Amino acid sequence: MNSKIFAVLFLLAFLSCVLSDQYCPKSSITACKKMNIRNDCCKDDDCTGGSWYCATPCGNFCKYPTDRPGGKRAAGGKSCKTGYVY
């Protein structure tokens, strides 16, 4: 009996984690001068601690996901380079 209760509780906890939508946070900056654009990362693997590779007007940065939509995941690709983008 206890194992059935545990299994149900575990399943509910697992589903709540899997089904909760996560997004990159919306940037508070709407524009950035070209000389200030830089990429801190070029893929999710560059980020640590559960943060994601997100796009902002000033470049790509590792950001922690939020439950509010509005941000943008970065596209990346082979042409992405870290550092300032001139």
Curated annotation (Swiss-Prot):
Query: Could you tell me the keywords of this UniProt record?
Result: Antibiotic, Antimicrobial, Disulfide bond, Secreted, Signal, Toxin
Q: What is the originating organism of this protein?
A: Lycosa singoriensis (Wolf spider)
Question: Which residues are in the WAP domain?
Answer: 21-66
**Functional note:** Has antibacterial activity.
Disulphide bonds in the chain: C24-C54, C32-C58, C42-C80, C47-C62
The protein's name in its UniProt record: U15-lycotoxin-Ls1b
A GO cellular component annotation here is: extracellular region
Which GO molecular function annotation, any one, does this entry have?
Answer: toxin activity
**Compartment(s) of residence:** Secreted
Regarding how it is modified after translation, the entry says: Contains 4 disulfide bonds.
Family of this protein: Belongs to the venom protein 11 family. 01 (wap-1) subfamily.
Q: Which residues form the signal peptide?
A: 1-20
Q: Name one GO biological process term.
A: defense response to bacterium
Q: In which tissues is it expressed?
A: Expressed by the venom gland.
